Amino acid sequence: MPRRREVAKRVILPDPKYNDRTVAKFINAIMLMGKKSTAEGIVYGAFDLIAERSGEEALDVFKKAVENIRPMLEVKSRRVGGSTYQVPVEVRADRRNALAIRWLILYARGRGEKTMVERLAGELLDAAANRGAAVKKREDTHRMAEANKAFAHYRW
């Protein structure tokens, strides 16, 4: 831990099209090798495809998808007397969002569709409907925490 001043958190400006900070973070997470305009093209293209396929507002579908993927609990390894326990801990609000976005992108990249726009749109629509690989990841994380509830008293 630093003994000097605490580092100020950088403020991420909302994205230009939807004026939303979560979308801006999502674009930044999609971005590879500093190519922000490409990342914006992928995200906005996926949003257009979502609006076309579902007939709903793309931003609402995105928000619902992120909400459905956010984990409430996770496990952290804690070493106690020679053995390591998986201790369930509650996830902070900012980390919940970060994990949801990270999982969405990870499982969208692993899908079988041809373009990233189609993959991302498919994963977002699946997540909004409470199905898909990212939702399964959240369920697995919660299941792990539930299975290790006996070690909750090791929390720090």
UniProtKB/Swiss-Prot annotation:
Its BP terms in the Gene Ontology are: translation
What Gene3D superfamilies does this protein map onto?
Ribosomal protein S7 domain
Q: Which GO terms describe its cellular component?
A: small ribosomal subunit
Q: Residues of the signal sequence?
A: none
Answer whether the UniProt record assigns the keyword rRNA-binding to this protein.
yes
Q: Which SUPFAM superfamilies match?
A: Ribosomal protein S7
Top-rank lineage group of the source organism: Bacteria
Listed A to Z, the keywords are: Ribonucleoprotein, Ribosomal protein, RNA-binding, rRNA-binding, tRNA-binding
Q: Which GO terms describe its molecular function?
A: rRNA binding; structural constituent of ribosome; tRNA binding
Which Pfam families does the UniProt entry name for this protein? Answer: Ribosomal_S7
Q: Give the record's subunit note.
A: Part of the 30S ribosomal subunit. Contacts proteins S9 and S11.
PANTHER family xrefs: RIBOSOMAL PROTEIN S7
In the record, the note on similarity to other proteins reads: Belongs to the universal ribosomal protein uS7 family.
State the function annotated in the UniProt record: One of the primary rRNA binding proteins, it binds directly to 16S rRNA where it nucleates assembly of the head domain of the 30S subunit. Is located at the subunit interface close to the decoding center, probably blocks exit of the E-site tRNA.
Q: Which HAMAP family match?
A: Ribosomal_uS7_B (MF_00480_B)
The name under which this protein is listed is: Small ribosomal subunit protein uS7
| Record organism | Syntrophotalea carbinolica (strain DSM 2380 / NBRC 103641 / GraBd1)
